[in-house]
Amino acid sequence: MDPEAIILSIEALRPSQETGISPSSALYLVAKKKRYTIKELRMARKILHTYSIYRRSASRYLENIISESMIDWVSKTILELISSCIIGGIDFGDITVLVSKLRQSMGKNWPEELEKHLGVLRLIHLRPMVEVNYPKWFTRYLEKIMGKMDAEYYLDFQDRVNPPMYASLNTLKMDEEKILKLAEERNIVLREDNRIPGIYLVEASNTKALKDLMNQGLIAIHDFSSYYAVKILKPKPNEFVLDVCSAPGTKTWLTALEMKNRGVIVSIDSSWKRIKSQVKRMNFLNVRIVEVIQADATKPLPIRLEVDKVIVDPPCSSTGLIWREPFYRWIIKPRHIRMFSNLQSKILQNSSRHVKQGGYLIYSTCSITIEENEHVIEDFLRINPNFELVEPSLSIGSHGLRNLAEARRLYPHTDMCNGFFIALLMRRY
């Protein structure tokens, strides 16, 4: 084990704990300050990912042995980091050898206080029960909506399995056959997902070659769920589409692909900074049919339009993203879910006013909570009888809860994608 990956992980945890950003985001910031090898960066990301899952288990274990007042931050962080990884199954080899390498690499920055506590690392041998690695409220919540057995499997699955990488080909810049040929020449395996044509599972041993295609705008990485949502909506060339809460623009681009760059997409987001980033990305991907508007969608939108299709992908608790960003499990609280639910209802209501008669609106979140999904749709349908929930033409995933059978739920352990909710609504009159 290269000690540089552990040292890099420690350096990333300081801004993470000081500012509240995720360890993976902090790693990105820290790594820009010094040149690291791809191997070191990959290992550091793996260490921080595992730490985010098991740090609560490691912390409880260490609290039973060491008083927090007796140990400095660096020593505590090193112990928690290595303990978390041992619990999570990362093989560091001989701990004595690892510590010796760390001591040598850190030099004068090595905390002497740590020496008397190193023995605890050799005592860790049992992996805790899965509930310890999640807040109790979250495990109980999942048991309530999924049942105890499915909830336990779901939680264990997303901590054990590496999320797959999905991509679509940017046919707005190059023909599909040519992109596939370029990928093959670079030993990038693109295996088409048999559930929906046009989305690929990416297997690339040469990450530099993959990055090269991405830097050319020929391939874009995104989750299966985003592609599925756009496919359900079925945007067509020459249609008028409204994309609400659109940044960073993944669904905007996927919609433009379906429309073959013909028609109009009006993208709305509350953040001018995100809008500027989205405009830059759309230009890079050769999307030519997007008009952008800065507006707060929790208030009536500053437009007088009735459009063919509306995409509503509001801010959410991101409970469906925990398998990609395990740090989220420790920062999401029930109060956040209630807050998001209220915000989502306002955004959905304001967006729905711009659907023409016979038009469609798709509502989606990367959350698996009922409050942000089924409750929002139930409340909306109750006060908007001119809309109805319709069955999607592509039946993937599970049916919605609370008798909303036409809605769709996706889960990592059953659908190998982010946890996701989708509801397709049609305006009848």
What does each model-found stretch correspond to?
Residues 1-429:
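S-adenosylmethionine
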